[in-house]
């Protein structure tokens, strides 16, 4: 299994769990995303290479940006334009999706942090819209 295939599997599982909240997995961006009137809520996934068929390391970031989002970075991210940016790797949480067992473990960890960080902040921000 390669990174794209593994991410498609993980993204599909996450969309299955969080789809009722409006989250969709975008294969091209490797993000699980939901938009509201004023914000974009996402989990962004990446990999730094060095992967094998049995070991696929991923980086997971939980991000909330104001809309419209400035993809070119003209607006410096701050608490007003990016109310949440949390990287698992920066917090020494390393995930591997290289096989089914590792995928299940990574899925549980991604969901734990989603439920702990992104969902409460999303509910708080949506209540103000």
Question: What is each stretch, according to the model?
Answer:
Residues 18:
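Acidic, metal-coordinating catalytic segment for phosphate/diphosphate chemistry
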Residues 1-13, 25-29, 33-129:
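Intrinsically disordered, low-complexity regulatory regions enriched in serine/threonine/proline
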């Amino acid at each position: 299994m390669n990174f794209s295939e593994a991410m498609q599997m993980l993204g599909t599982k996450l969309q299955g769990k969080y789809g009722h909240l409006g989250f969709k997995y975008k294969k091209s961006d490797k993000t699980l995303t939901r938009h509201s009137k004023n914000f974009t809520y996402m989990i962004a996934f990446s990999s730094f290479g060095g992967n094998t068929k049995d070991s696929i390391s991923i980086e997971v970031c939980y991000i909330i940006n104001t809309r419209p989002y400035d993809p070119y970075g003209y607006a410096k991210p701050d608490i007003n334009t990016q109310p949440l940016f949390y990287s698992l790797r920066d917090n020494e949480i390393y995930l591997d999706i290289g096989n089914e067992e590792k995928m299940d473990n990574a899925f549980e960890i991604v969901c734990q942090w989603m439920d702990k960080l992104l969902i409460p902040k999303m509910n708080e921000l949506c209540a103000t819209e």
